[in-house]
Amino acid sequence: MKLSNQAHLAYCTNVHRGNSWQETFDSLENYVMKVREGVAPEQRFAIGLRLGADAGRELADTRKLYEFRKWLEEKNVYVFTINGFPYGNFHGSPVKEQVYRPDWTTNERMDYTLLLFSILENLLEPGEEGSVSTLPGSFKEFLPGEEIPDILLKKVGACALEIEKLAGPKNLDLHLGMEPEPLGLFETTAETVSFFDKLFDKGTDEEIIRKRIGVNYDCCHLAIEFEDAHEGLDSLVKHGIRLSKLHLSSALSAKPTENNLLRLKDFIEPVYLHQVTLGKDGQCIRRI
């Protein structure tokens, strides 16, 4: 839905299971529509659609895409952005650092991302804006060297040129949002600025790269880095980096009472990454 300042506010579906297109569509009907009824039943409702590679390939089928467009019209909902960070499974079985595979050194990541843009292009009306979010290049431990590999920068730059081609026929404002995240190739605002400086320097067409590649600023990720959001966003704008999208999430605030600590143990699980800071003696300084 649109806010008073005309910005789009969407409900993101990555919180629901959906490896296949059928699973994804079922979550739209069973969960997203219930959220819509509780939040904005009379307004045109926006969906931030998470599509893994399998679901994306299935939805790219001409008939399925047509049926999905009809469903969107009937339900008075729309998709203006796609979460393209998790390529494969994102629920149930351990994900952890595997969520970064394939990374931006591979053709698989670029092909998958462009597939999502192709789907989005079909869902948007002429002249509209749309985005896809993606990982921050790679996982730090996958690329232990100090320098960012040229192949990664070239893949992202090449993706920008392909997005430019996709956007042209319908005059769409399409852009890719790279998402800084703890343990990612770039995780802080300073590292993000450094990455984009290298990206602009290595690219064959800086103007197109600046137009088509930006940052998906996930507030919870940068909060884990103890960053001030106002300062971080101001820095990105100052350096001419496009703000592709903002991710907002909420968390419970609880005092460390015995009962609360017991309840929080439910969050000890093997599926997702948990950021922990240890001292030299091995003692936990902080765990996020």
Protein language model regions, located:
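N-terminal pre-domain/capping segments
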Residues: 1-127, 131, 161, 207-212, ...
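Active-site beta-loop-alpha junctions enriched in small/polar residues
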Residues: 14-16, 50-54, 84-87, 135-139, ...
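A broadly tuned preference for mixed-charge, low-complexity surface segments
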Residues: 63-68, 130-137, 239, 271-274
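Active-site acidic/histidine proton-transfer and metal-coordination neighborhood
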Residues: 93-214
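Short, solvent-exposed loop/turn segments at secondary-structure boundaries
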Residues: 57-61, 143-147, 227
